């Protein structure tokens, strides 16, 4: 995993602790067999255009992003045993349920990735 943070293009920090998948196994595992994310955590899965919560015990919020990190779709509180997808996305940010409203993330917003030093 690669660790970093996501900001809006105006430098407003969105998520301080983001893990980005770096290989196939990390993408396949996702959040399976893990504790729920906290408000300030996220998992960025790339490349990815669909997500499932099969086998998970908790709901998550999803942010589908294109290659330029523009939000193309959001999904609120995807419950366990469900699937969500977006043909326009190349990566997905998984967040704790109810994070979208707190972070004020909406379609069309531009994000930026920053590696941890």
Ranges and model annotations:
Residues 1-117:
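Compact, glycine-rich, soluble single-domain proteins
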């Amino acid at each position: 995993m690669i660790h970093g943070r996501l900001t809006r293009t105006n430098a407003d920090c969105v998520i301080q602790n983001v893990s980005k998948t770096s290989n196939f196994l990390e993408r396949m595992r996702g959040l399976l067999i893990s504790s729920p994310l906290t408000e300030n955590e996220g998992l960025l899965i790339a490349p990815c255009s669909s997500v499932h919560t099969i086998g998970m015990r908790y709901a998550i919020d999803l942010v589908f992003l294109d290659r330029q990190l523009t939000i193309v779709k959001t999904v609120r509180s995807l419950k366990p045993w469900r699937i969500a997808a977006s043909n326009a996305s190349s990566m997905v940010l998984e967040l704790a349920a109810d994070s979208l409203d707190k972070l004020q993330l909406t379609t069309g917003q531009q994000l930026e990735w920053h590696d941890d030093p």
